[in-house]
């Protein structure tokens, strides 16, 4: 309510069409800490939307930019998992209006390109997978100290205000709590969708999830929702087992507990009946382990974790020749503008519990503390509020 009143007040002051000054966490270069700066956010141009951010999650992908393992131009405002309210719209915008509660989408859905028109596709041609760091017209809406600041993954949510393309925003139910449903903007949807959309887990099946971070836990929740009868969680850190069991895992194991290959351990545990495996770590070795662990003839293995850049994978092609299916997905294979509002509605109907994934809620000014929690392994998801 407070944020909505604030939007109304700003409308009365006539911010639409004008530059807004606000606080943002700017990364001036890689491997350097965030700097909380006053930035200028330009008005939205044609088919663009300016959003007041209410809450934003800290995701491992953001940390990849800091560490230099993900391509980005600098300076940049990262962050891509958020909830906000539309402050103003550019010419030609028809799907949202000022005052609407929305989720910015790092994976756009233009509904016109081949991927958007294909029922099985979701990697929209407007996706910024190469780290261009600008909007559709090739420019940025952010300025700091007289210098242009780049966008990140079409979203840039570590700021009080951002500007996105209309194809990168989904209107959601106004009753949705922003500090919870922001996770639907990335982490939860990526894992949940990997199970229900990409993997197409069948009722009564056995699933194995490699990696029990926030996305891995979301995969477990998706497997449970799809009706899997057995869900095995795998992680080197046994401290993660309790939470995995709480969200739906039927058992958890650590590879360190056996000298046998993990695929052999799983075969013995299940009577050689693993239907689905999910690699949610991003390590080449575990991608192959996950593939080898599903049934050699009818098993499906899904790569969910972001693989390291500039690395090549070597594997025995017989793993596929016998009939296994090996798949990957971005955003769980979901069509962002279509599926995000549906997931918010399902959350409000208590189909799944996002509280299980949120371990910390901090004010935006403590963003660096949030990343310390991430890198020390103390958090699953930290949400920053404005």
UniProtKB/Swiss-Prot annotation:
EC number(s) of the enzyme? 1.1.1.105, 1.1.1.1, 1.1.1.66
Q: Which domain of life is it from?
A: Eukaryota
Q: Where in the cell is it found?
A: Cytoplasm
A Pfam family recorded for this sequence: ADH_zinc_N
Q: Where does Zn(2+) 2 bind?
A: 110, 113, 116, 124
Listed SUPFAM superfamilies: GroES-like, NAD(P)-binding Rossmann-fold domains
UniProt catalytic activity: a primary alcohol + NAD(+) = an aldehyde + NADH + H(+); 10-hydroxydecanoate + NAD(+) = 10-oxodecanoate + NADH + H(+); all-trans-retinol + NAD(+) = all-trans-retinal + NADH + H(+); 9-cis-retinol + NAD(+) = 9-cis-retinal + NADH + H(+)
Q: Which BP terms does GO give this entry? A: fatty acid omega-oxidation; response to bacterium; response to ethanol; retinoic acid metabolic process; retinoid metabolic process; retinol metabolic process
Which InterPro entries did the record assign? ADH-like_C (IPR013149), ADH-like_N (IPR013154), ADH_Zn_CS (IPR002328), GroES-like_sf (IPR011032), NAD(P)-bd_dom_sf (IPR036291)
Q: Which residues participate in Zn(2+) 1 binding?
A: 59, 80, 186
- Which CDD domains does the protein's record reference? alcohol_DH_class_I_II_IV (cd08299)
Q: Which Gene3D superfamilies match?
A: Medium-chain alcohol dehydrogenases, catalytic domain, NAD(P)-binding Rossmann-like Domain
Please classify the protein's predominant subcellular localization into one broad category.
Answer: cytoplasm
Q: Name one GO molecular function term.
A: receptor antagonist activity
First and last residue of the signal peptide: none
Which Gene Ontology cellular component terms are annotated? cytosol; plasma membrane
Q: What regulation of activity is recorded for this protein?
A: Retinol oxidation is inhibited by the detergent Tween 80. Ethanol inhibits both all-trans-retinol and 9-cis-retinol oxidation. 13-cis-retinol is an effective competitive inhibitor of the 9-cis-retinol oxidation. All-trans-retinoic acid is a powerful inhibitor of all-trans-retinol oxidation. 13-cis-retinoic acid is a powerful inhibitor of all-trans-retinol oxidation. Cimetidine competitively inhibited ethanol oxidation.
Recorded hits in PANTHER family, A to Z, give:
ALCOHOL DEHYDROGENASE, ALL-TRANS-RETINOL DEHYDROGENASE [NAD(+)] ADH7
Q: How does it assemble?
A: Homodimer.
Family named by the database record = Belongs to the zinc-containing alcohol dehydrogenase family. Class-IV subfamily.
This molecule's function is given as: Catalyzes the NAD-dependent oxidation of all-trans-retinol, alcohol, and omega-hydroxy fatty acids and their derivatives. Oxidizes preferentially all trans-retinol, all-trans-4-hydroxyretinol, 9-cis-retinol, 2-hexenol, and long chain omega-hydroxy fatty acids such as juniperic acid. In vitro can also catalyze the NADH-dependent reduction of all-trans-retinal and aldehydes and their derivatives. Reduces preferentially all trans-retinal, all-trans-4-oxoretinal and hexanal. Catalyzes in the oxidative direction with higher efficiency.
Name of the molecule in the record: All-trans-retinol dehydrogenase [NAD(+)] ADH7
Q: What is the lineage of its organism?
A: Eukaryota, Metazoa, Chordata, Craniata, Vertebrata
């Amino acid at each position: 309510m407070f944020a909505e009143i604030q939007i109304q007040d700003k409308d009365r002051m006539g911010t639409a069409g004008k530059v807004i000054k606000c606080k943002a966490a700017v990364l001036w270069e890689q491997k350097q800490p965030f700097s909380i700066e006053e930035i200028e956010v330009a008005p939205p141009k044609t088919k663009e939307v300016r959003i007041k951010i209410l809450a934003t999650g800290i995701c491992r992908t953001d940390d990849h930019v800091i560490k230099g393992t993900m391509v980005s131009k600098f300076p940049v405002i990262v962050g891509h998992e958020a909830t906000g309210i539309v402050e103003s719209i550019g010419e030609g915008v028809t799907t949202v209006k000022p005052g609407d509660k929305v989720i910015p989408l790092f994976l756009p859905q233009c509904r016109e390109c081949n991927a958007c028109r294909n029922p099985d596709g979701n990697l929209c041609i407007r996706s910024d997978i190469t780290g261009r760091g600008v909007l559709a017209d090739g420019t940025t809406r952010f300025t700091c100290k007289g210098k242009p600041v780049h966008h990140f993954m079409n979203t840039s949510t570590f700021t009080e205000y951002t500007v996105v393309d209309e194809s990168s925003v989904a209107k959601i139910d106004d009753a949705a709590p922003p500090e919870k449903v922001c996770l639907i903007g990335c982490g939860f949807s990526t894992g949940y969708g990997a199970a229900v959309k990409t993997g197409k887990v069948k009722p009564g099946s056995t699933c194995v999830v490699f990696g029990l971070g926030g996305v891995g836990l979301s995969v477990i929740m998706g497997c449970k929702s799809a009706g899997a009868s057995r869900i095995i969680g795998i992680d080197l850190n046994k401290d993660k087992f309790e939470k995995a069991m709480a969200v739906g895992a039927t058992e958890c194991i650590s590879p360190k507990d056996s000298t046998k290959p993990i695929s052999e351990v799983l075969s013995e545990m299940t009577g050689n009946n693993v239907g689905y495996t999910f690699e949610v770590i991003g390590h080449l070795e575990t991608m192959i382990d996950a593939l080898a662990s599903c049934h050699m003839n009818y098993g499906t293995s899904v790569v969910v974790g972001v693989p390291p850049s500039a690395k090549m994978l070597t594997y025995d092609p017989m793993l596929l020749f016998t009939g296994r299916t090996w798949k990957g997905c971005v955003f769980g294979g979901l069509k962002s503008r279509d599926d995000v509002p549906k997931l918010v509605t399902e959350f409000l109907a208590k189909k799944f519990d996002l509280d299980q994934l949120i371990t910390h809620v901090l004010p935006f000014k403590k963003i660096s503390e949030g990343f310390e929690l991430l890198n020390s392994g103390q958090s699953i998801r930290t949400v920053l509020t404005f």
